[in-house]
Amino acid sequence: MIISGIDYSLRSPCVCIFAGLEKESFTFNRCTFYFLTDTKKYATFFLNNIHGERFQDWNQDFQRYKSIADWTMDKVIGSEQIAIEGYSMGSKGKVFHIAENTGVLKYKIYNTGIPLEVIPPTSVKKFATGKGNADKDQMHQQFMRDTGIDLKSKITPDKTKVSNPVSDIVDAYYICKFLYDKIIENYTRS
């Protein structure tokens, strides 16, 4: 089984790809992560399965949306199923830009025929922590409990709070795990 979880954004999109058998448990080590960043020091490899890459240069918004969607499609192609975090209803700022950006990706996924599951952000947070309004720090704390890995100390040790790309990796992990658990639940029912 190859499935993907996407934490999609304009500033730091992240993809988590799980490759394993239905009988194998979902673990951090069976996942590969890819994220985009504007920060040069994050455009590198971490922990053997996390890949940071720089954004492509762009001159207009649609060019940016296309390059992010193309990058994401390059990562998820070959997946049997994909999950993406839905829109946050409390979003502020460039909500139309976020919607246009995400729409380009959803259209590209639709054209491949790969099933796409859209998961509300509150469902991802509740799945991970038991609280639908968990913040980035709470999500990271739960990730550390579940995996034994402190991404903040490995990737952003100079930051005082959990931020990009750590929060995006954590979110993508739980989006992918949410999809995995749903697939396994349906598999065991049939």
Q: Where is each model-derived feature located?
A:
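Phosphate- and other anionic-substrate recognition elements at nucleic-acid/protein interfaces
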Residues: 1-190
